[in-house]
């Protein structure tokens, strides 16, 4: 392992916990050539791999002296304090379809994972099966769910380009993720179930390299003590659960609260409003309760049809020896007692806003599994919200970004891939925010004016970057703790503390948040509080503007509206394309920032060059472009439209 290779690894990381070390990977690659050794149960503090007590182990850190691992029988005790990045664990030099059992303690502060982790080659893939985490739950492009070992995992895929891997220090490869919806520390991971679920979504593995039950941390502190062993099974068939479809509709399952004897599941149907869903219970499972649908049948099969409450329903399943989520299939013909015609969405009743407005915020979207459910609930209740997507998720889910815009929610910026920005250089901060601005402009056609720093961490340098992009920093007054495994009732209780102008932190991905949202909106209505948007001037929740939709990319008066999409950018200038809708006879007023000036324009007649600029049609249609000189400000000029 050369010094140059280690130096490359030390500086390469941009997203916390996104990809493991080239140094660790290189060590694992040659693990088969290592002589079997049995180190004493002493603290390991330097980068190494080997065998101990019959298990392969790996230890890597870029902050020597701040992390140690004691090699104990069957597992290791790891301690870390204010470390940069590390990963440590025990497992097998050659992975595969193993049933892995583990137990112990995992006590992170801030950013860490407890994960079954490994690599394959041909194709080169880095994979994670995450059972618990600290302050950040990993996300990516949402691919579906898999139910295994008593829990439901969200499946994500991400890609790394020119990054260290087990094959060298400049590889391009996919990462596959299964992230448990409810945290746990201890149990069984049937890896074959995850491998099969990934394969069903085109996420194929190759020849297995190493596999370890790992603790990984980044810029955090904590401790873990994990004992690992291999079970008797080989992984079995894929227990993908979660949904299926036929003849025009599909159904997805979201696991919710769980107790020792029972658990809740929410099923959501798409593609038809006249549907029949068949649930296949496992073993001796029974249905204790249901809501928002008619449920009939006995034995191992239940038939579910609409009852006028929409296309989402829930059941409480008594385990009776099985914790597996009942599989669901959908038929769009309705059949039997299904509602013969689509059930209309209820028109929201007028609401008093005499107590003021509050800001519901959802971070880390959009996600295929939950975003549409959140938007559907908001629409049903005549409510709105502010969303803070990451640039990575925005780029990977353009249709959901359009869904955000069409639903009229306010769209802010949440960085490209959720790093600890305060530990980055100013240029890296600038890149994180600028790339996200561009991704949102390209996918939703709006320009954010709000920014929420990941983890709520900020400093003077970051605020300077925000200001240069015309962004207002938004934190929160109430933390729902949904990121920390809070239940739906706990999230709802947190929202009950909101008062006029205040903002609550929630996230796009937790199933419990989706389940809590209807109750939150009902509670606000009963208190004469309305949902609003966040003012970029004051940072407080206010009545939503009539323009709706985005985060400050445009506005309208009369019968036209205008949106802005940021284009090319250079050191001294940038391009913006403005698109007008609603009228062919329009006047757009542009508000330039600071010392900005107009260098050139196309497809419209412009009057003025600094301060306030007016644009009118010149016969070239309803889209026009402008090149602005920055002169100290990179913020996109705001635009309003009036018919003329």
UniProtKB/Swiss-Prot annotation:
Residues 222-249, 327-351, 536-560 are annotated as: Disordered. It comes from the Bacteria. Residues 231-247, 547-558 have a biased composition (Gly residues). The active site is at residues 126, 216. PROSITE patterns: CBM2, GH11_1, GH11_2, GH11_3, NODB, TAT. Keywords: Carbohydrate metabolism, Glycosidase, Hydrolase, Multifunctional enzyme, Polysaccharide degradation, Repeat, Signal, Xylan degradation. Residues 44-229 form the GH11 domain. Residues 231-245, 548-556 are annotated as: Linker ('hinge') (Gly-rich box). Residues 1-43 form the signal peptide. Residues 356-532 form the NodB homology domain. Pathway: Glycan degradation; xylan degradation. This is Bifunctional xylanase/deacetylase. It comes from Cellulomonas fimi. The gene is xynD.
